[in-house]
Amino acid sequence: YQAYGVEPDGACFAKGLAGGVPIGAFMAKDKLAQAFKPGDHASTFGGNPFATSCGTVVMHELLDGGLLDNVKKQGELLSKRLMELKQKHSIIKEARGFGLIQGIELTIPAGDVIADCINNGLLLVGAGANVIRFVPALIVTEKEINEAMDILDKALFRAEEK
């Protein structure tokens, strides 16, 4: 929501909140929060001591440990490399996304390109018939992004030769 200038009255959080340990949370502005009484809203994994301890560590890393700086830096590199590939390969219709959630839309079905990448050590997943998603770990390195883009580049060349 922050990338679009939206400020929600409430938001649900889960999944990555505790680094893979099951947890859930709901945050709300005062006006909305006042509508809830104890027991109105619950989460199976919302507040046990182990999960909340893990969540505290994750929040510390996100806010104070420099992790978000790495996400920004590597996201910019990923975007740059995908745009370079778009200029190089006519089968890339569009490169889109921001941060470490990005994708390319191809003019051909993405399945063969994805399979080629997987066969060469790059695990990818599609999003629909013609889109390849890139959602690397938040700790991804510059070397890993460049290696991934090099594998993708070769797979795109092979797809264009068909």
Region locations from a protein language model:
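Conserved N-terminal phosphate-binding loop of PLP-dependent enzymes in the Aspartate aminotransferase
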Residues: 1-162
